[in-house]
Amino acid sequence: MLTSLAFIFLVGLSLAALCQALKLPRIIGMLITGILLGPYVLNALDSSILSISSELRQIALIIILLKAGLSLNLADLKKVGRPAVMMACVPASFEIFAYILLAPTFLGITRLEAAVMGAVMGAVSPAVVVPRMVQFMEEKYGTDKSIPQMILAGASCDDIYVIVLFSTFSAVAQGGSAHLQDFINIPISIVLGILLGSATGYLVSLFFETAYAHSHMVRNSMKVIVVMGVSFLLMSVETWLKPIVSVSGLLAVVSMACVLKLKCTPSVSTRLSQKFGKLWLAAEVLLFVLVGASVDIRYTLKAGPAALAMIFAALLIRTLGVSLCVAGTNLTAKEKLFCSIAYLPKATVQAAIGSVPMAMGLSCGQIVLSVAVLGILITAPLGAIGMDCSYKRLLTRESCK
C-alpha cells in the first residue's frame, strides 16, 4: 500500500506539474496518472488501495466541501435563490431527456436503457467544479452576482437528484417498478441534509466557544481534526438512515461548514478554511488519480463515433437547461456562457455508478460503461480547461468595479 501511495503522489504531482507547464489543468495529469497506474494499464496499484478507493475519494470530496462551506457567504446565496434551486435539477433533466430522445437512434438501445444511460451521465462533477468555484470566490470573480456560489450550490445538489433517478430507472429496467416515494425522497434528502448539517455546525461551534470560555484553548489544527471527524459521522448518518429516510450527507457537510463560518469569529473560520485548503493539496491528487484508476480505458475503444456524437449532443441540450435556469436574471451573456461551461465536467458520479448497470446484468451495461468512461475522458478536461481559460474573460472581478 505504501508503494502505491508513493506512486499516486509522486507520479500524480509530476504529471500535474507537467500539465501546468503546458498551460493545461493539473487534474488532466492526475487523471492520466490514475489511468496509467490503474488495473487496466500498468496495474501498479495495490489491491488494498483500490478496495478502499471509493472511501478515499469520499474523504477528499469532504475536504473540498468543507473548504467550500467555509468560503460561502449565505447572504450572497440568498440573492440567487431561484437559479440555484433550478441548477440542482433542470440541466440534469435536460441531459437525461436528450439521452431518452436521441440514444435509441445513435446507439440502438431502448428508451428505458437510454434513461438509465442518461441518469449515469446527468450529474456534474463536484470534484471538478467545487474547487474552482472556491478559487473564483477567493479571487472575487463573479462574486458581485454570486455566480460561483450559485454554481457551487447547484453542483452540490444535482448528484442527489441524478442518483435517485438512476436507482429508479435501473430498478425498472431490471423488471421492477418506479415508486412515488423515490421522487418524494429528493426534496426530503436535501432539506434533512441541510437541517442536520446546520444543527451539527451550531453544536460544534458551541463546543469551541464553551472550551474557549473555560480557558481550554483548542488549537486550530485540533479544530480541523474535530470538524473532519464530525463530517465523517455526517456521511455515515446518510448510510445508517438509508432504510428509514433519505438524508444527503454531502449537503450536511457543506451546511455544517456554512454554520461554522457564521458562528465562529472571522479569524477562526478564515484559518480553518486555509487549513482545509492545505489538506486539499494532497486530497486533490488522491481523488483524481483514483478516479482515473477506476476508468477502464478499454471501453473507450468500444464506444465508437456514435457515442462521441451522443455525448456532445446531450451536452448541447444540457446547456439549454442551464440557459433556462439563468433566464430572467441580471447575468450578462458572457456570465451565462460561463455557467454553461461550468456545468460540463463529469467524473466522480460517472466513475462511481458507470459500471453498475453491467453488474446488474442489464443488456445495456457495456455501452453505458463505455459512454461513461468516454464522458469522463472528454468532459472533465474540457470543463476544467473551459473554466480555467474563460473565467477572467467572462466574469467580472468585484474589486475592479
Regions found by a protein language model. Give the residues of each.
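Hydrophobic transmembrane alpha-helices of secondary-active transporters
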Residues: 31-38, 54-80, 96, 169-174, ...
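Structural signature of hydrophobic alpha-helical transmembrane segments
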Residues: 1-8, 49-66, 111-126, 186-199, ...
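Interfacial helix-loop-helix linkers and transmembrane-helix boundary segments
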Residues: 19-24, 44-53, 70-87, 109-113, ...
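Helix-coil boundary and interhelical linker segments in multi-pass alpha-helical membrane proteins
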Residues: 1, 42-52, 101-114, 170-184, ...
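Small-residue-rich segments of transmembrane alpha-helices in multi-pass membrane proteins
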Residues: 30-41, 86-100, 150-163, 220-236, ...
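Core mid-bundle transmembrane helix pairs that form the ion/substrate translocation pathway
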Residues: 5-17, 157, 163, 167-286, ...
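Alpha-helical transmembrane segments and their lipid-water interface positions
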Residues: 30-33, 42, 61-65, 95-103, ...
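Transmembrane alpha-helices that form the ion-translocation and gating core
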Residues: 74, 78-142, 297-395
